[in-house]
Amino acid sequence: MNPAHLLVLAAVCVSLLGAAIVPPQPLNLYQFNNMIQCANHGNRPTWHYAHYGCYCGKGGGGTAVDELDRCCQTHDNCYGEAEKLPKCSPYYKTYKYDCSEGKLTCKDAPGSCERSVCDCDRVAANCFAGAPYNNDNFFISFKENCQ
């Protein structure tokens, strides 16, 4: 076999090996992103919510700093309730929904994991759209502000 072909084959194998050990990315976050954009009509990029206050983004704790941060706290609590359902992993569970002129509608059966997660995301997206955004609360120090 040609050395160049062996090099390409080795690179592909290493890439596949690396892909096999990378944990799956939360599929639901893609849907949640789309819900946020639907509810706020694309007026604010979703990443603006990723490190906002004490609860928006990964983890959370302390006292929410404002209305928008309380939206995230409520969303975190909602996911916590959804996790109590059998085999329900809110960060990975996908669901069916519609977005029409800023109105979000969850389509899965009431009481199902999918519907519960969808409702968590729908309520949060609508809450985000209605809450004021304070730039001073973006990337605040968790240690100083959220204890």
Swiss-Prot record:
Paired cysteines (S-S): C38-C99, C54-C146, C56-C72, C71-C127, C78-C120, C88-C113, C106-C118
A single Gene Ontology CC term: extracellular region
Signal sequence range: 1-19
Binding site for Ca(2+): Y55, G57, G59, D76
Top-level taxon of the source organism: Eukaryota
Reported tissue expression: Expressed by the venom gland.
Keyword Repeat set for record: no
Propeptide: 20-27
Cofactor section: Ca(2+)
MF (Gene Ontology): calcium ion binding; calcium-dependent phospholipase A2 activity; phospholipid binding
Keyword Signal set for record: yes
Annotated catalysed reactions: a 1,2-diacyl-sn-glycero-3-phosphocholine + H2O = a 1-acyl-sn-glycero-3-phosphocholine + a fatty acid + H(+)
CDD domains to which the protein is assigned, alphabetical: PLA2c (cd00125)
Cofactor binding description: Binds 1 Ca(2+) ion.
Location in the cell: Secreted
Catalytic site: H75, D121
Function: PLA2 catalyzes the calcium-dependent hydrolysis of the 2-acyl groups in 3-sn-phosphoglycerides.
PANTHER family linked to this entry: PHOSPHOLIPASE A2 (PTHR11716:SF94), PHOSPHOLIPASE A2 FAMILY MEMBER (PTHR11716)
Family the UniProt entry places it in: Belongs to the phospholipase A2 family. Group I subfamily. D49 sub-subfamily.
Name used for this protein in its record: Acidic phospholipase A2 1
Biological source species: Bungarus flaviceps flaviceps
